[in-house]
Structure formats: structure tokens, C-alpha cells
Amino acid sequence: MQRKIKSYVLRAGRISNRQQQGLDLWLEDYELKFDSPSPWNFAKEFGRHDADTIVEIGFGMGTSLFTMAMNNPQCNYLGIEVHKAGVGSLVADLHEHQITNVRVVVHDAVDVLQTKIPENSLAGVQIFFPDPWHKKRHHKRRLIQSEFIQMLVKKIRPSGFIHCATDWEDYAEHILNVLSSESALFNQQKEGGYSPRPDSRPLTKFEQRGERLGHGVWDLVFIKK
């Protein structure tokens, strides 16, 4: 898969003292280096065998990833994020609460999936609130495209899941079409369409505010055959 168009733009944003502390002091405890020579062995990287590994692509400030890791200590979580403020925030939280079942990689998700994730190694992939690139001329920048999903399917084991969530209805329709068109997947909703928010996905403060204002959120959960 050759994807030259990035689904994100790196902007120079403010980093708080706590976030910088996370990057400077504790990132090395959690980071998987992209420049290692071979695909990762998750049993080695997490220090345990037989644990399911779930990847979150674009974890933002890490709120959902942190909560899910804390609630599911039996699972491994690998977070992929390019924005340093979010990485620092998550790492600081992980250190403060001594969470040990999370690793992070600070790199482009497409590159990571192509070269570092073994095939059939993941229990699931979650992509929560990816950039909708709502202007039509920018739709080509959207992360979730057919080629990208085809690559994800190879990395997920049979019965593994892809869970997407978005608060942009047009993007939800696009994601539904892309996932429904992939023959290796089936919709967890037997009647098709969108899923209720699974209890496993934490409700963010942003989402709670949106609900009060009447804004919609669409969850999509597809399973690999």
C-alpha cells in the first residue's frame, strides 16, 4: 500500500509542563521505536504471552486509551499518535497510575502497520474520532479508505474487530460504506448500519457536551470473518 497523502497535519502546538515532563522522563518506559529492524513481537514487548493486543490509531490526549487499559489489564494496548502533546499527556497518566499494559509509538500509522505489525497478530483496532476532513476537496486525506482497511484486515486475526467512532455524519456514512464493502468483514449489527456505543468505549467529556447539545455520534463495529 502506497499512501503519500497524510491524514494529519503536524502543527506546532503548546505543550504543558506536565506533557513535556512525560516526554522527557517517562516516554522511554512505554515507547516502541519505529526504527527497530524487524516487526514487533508483542509477547516480548509487553513481557507476557497470550494477552490480546489492541491498537488505537490516533489516540489524541489518550483519555479513552488510558481508561480502557486501566479497565482491561488482561489486554495489551498499543497507541499510535504523532502529536507530541497527546503522547506526553498519556505517558504522564500511565506513569502516575502505574499502568503497565500500554505501549506507544510516535509515528505515522500507515508506516507502522505496513512494517511493524505482524499479520493476524491483533485482537482489534480502534479509531475514535479521526479527522473528518469535512471539505469535499480534502476527502482524499481521510484515513479510512478501502486500501487502508484492506491492510488492517491482514493485521487482525479472525474474529478480531475494527471499531470506529465519529461525530461527523458524512464521514460515518463513508466509513460504513468502506467497511461494508470489505468482503473479509461483517457488521456486528445484524440488521446493518451503526452500533450503539459499546460499554468498552469510554464516553469523553467532549462527547458528553455534544450529547447535551444534540450532536450525534456514530459507532461502527465490524468483525473479521
From Swiss-Prot:
S-adenosyl-L-methionine binds at residues 56, 81, 108, 131. InterPro entries: SAM-dependent_MTases_sf, tRNA_(Gua-N-7)_MeTrfase_Trmb, tRNA_methyltr_TrmB_bact. Substrate binds at residues 135, 167, 204-207. Pathway: tRNA modification; N(7)-methylguanine-tRNA biosynthesis. One of its GO terms (cellular component) is tRNA methyltransferase complex. The active site is at residue 131. It holds the Pfam family Methyltransf_4. Keywords: Methyltransferase, S-adenosyl-L-methionine, Transferase, tRNA processing. Its EC number is 2.1.1.33. GO terms for molecular function: tRNA (guanine(46)-N7)-methyltransferase activity. It catalyses: guanosine(46) in tRNA + S-adenosyl-L-methionine = N(7)-methylguanosine(46) in tRNA + S-adenosyl-L-homocysteine. Catalyzes the formation of N(7)-methylguanine at position 46 (m7G46) in tRNA. Belongs to the class I-like SAM-binding methyltransferase superfamily. TrmB family. This is tRNA (guanine-N(7)-)-methyltransferase. It comes from Legionella pneumophila (strain Corby). The lineage of its organism: Bacteria, Pseudomonadati, Pseudomonadota, Gammaproteobacteria, Legionellales. The gene is trmB.
